[in-house]
Amino acid sequence: HFAQRYATILARNGVTLEIKASAGSLENLARLKDNEAQVGFVQGGVVPPKEDPDVEDDSGLLSLGSMFYEPVWVFYRCDKILTRLTELHGKRIAIGQEGSGVRQLARQLLDANDIPEDNHLVPLAGLGAAEELQQGRIDAAFIIAAETAPVVQVLIRSPGVKLMSFAQDRAYQRRFPFLTKLTFPRGVVDLVRDFPPDDIKVLAPTANLII
């Protein structure tokens, strides 16, 4: 989506951008390091911070800056309202495909809540995860996408599916400095139906443009 927008902008200046689909940030990073791509979006937090900030970076890669926020949406099915990830213990959770930034971040957040990597964590992403959640075959799904992305809009409007508001958003931001806390305002989806009925607190890394 964002790559296509940049391709359109660059085309106006005579620059042709070849868009390559990938599983996500980890694969993008690998392609950049292997010179299989010259420019890529990489999710904040994917590259661990250097133990010694004074040591020179020898990766050969350069960040041109943070381009936009990528909210982390945790959708779930449950009779009660959940506000903490620890409440998903023992549930079947879609955490994204291997090589994706959503999978890495989901693992970091779940590890922090003592939720082990076992057969309850399934490698589903996007609309595939949304369909499984709608059908009740999984209990929760991590989605990283813009608010306007089809998968987010589909799940927000799905009967029986709820969106988690992170009660511990400040604690996550303190523990994971690459995350920013954002608010999904009350009524933003539908003013007439007043949906969502309350502000939703979400977390978001940034997408960085790497060359």
Predicted segments — roles?
Residues S22, L26-Q38, G44-V47, D58-S59, ...:
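Membrane-embedded segments
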Residues H1-N13, E70-Q135:
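Bilobed "Venus flytrap"/periplasmic-binding protein-like clamshell domains
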Residues D111, E117-I210:
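Pocket-lining segment of extracytoplasmic ligand-binding domains
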Residues A21-S25, N35-P48, G126, I143-A149, ...:
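Beta->alpha turn/N-cap motifs
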Residues D57-M67, L191-I200:
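A structural signal for short loop-to-beta-strand junctions that line the ligand-binding cleft
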Residues H1-V39:
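Extracytoplasmic small-molecule ligand-binding "clamshell" domains
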Residues N28-A30, P49-D52, T83-R84, V102-L105, ...:
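Extracytoplasmic/secreted cell-surface and envelope-processing proteins
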Residues T16-I19, L29, G60-L61, K91-G99, ...:
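Second-shell loop/turn segments in exported
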